[in-house]
Amino acid sequence: MTTTQIKNIYTGTVMYEGESGMTTRQMLEKAIASQADLRGANLGGADLYSANLGGADLRGADLRGADLRGANLYSANLGGANLGGKFGKLIEGRPYFQCGPLGSRSDYLQSFITDKGIVIKAGCFTGFLDDFVAAVKETHGDSDHGKEYAMAILMIEEHAAIWGQP
């Protein structure tokens, strides 16, 4: 019987092994439930939409391209997790904030406080906060969606001010 695995991004060692046919999300939720040590887990590109990651220790994990929309990250430790390339690594503490559904797509807006600044993921947009603010102004202006995004941006800025914007 073949199995699927979560490996350490740095050493390549198997951190958790799941049953054949399990999605990464299912395997990760099972690993968290069994209190597996997932520090440094290679989760790049994983579909973790609406996953229950509450309480997980994902310090130093590779989250490049992972879909975290709607995921429960309550009490999850994401310090030092890698968002990839130009976006840097998450700071220690509370680097993640999510709100929604909102905007023209009625989707979740995610923000990450990294060592290089605040990164936003909203729909197909992934970029720094300043670029997101400009895109919202250009696309939505003073419409209801624009106003809703503006309020979310204020919350994101406050969250970053409280929890350690670099």
Show the residue positions of the predicted features.
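Leucine-rich solenoid repeat scaffolds
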Residues: 74-118, 122-135
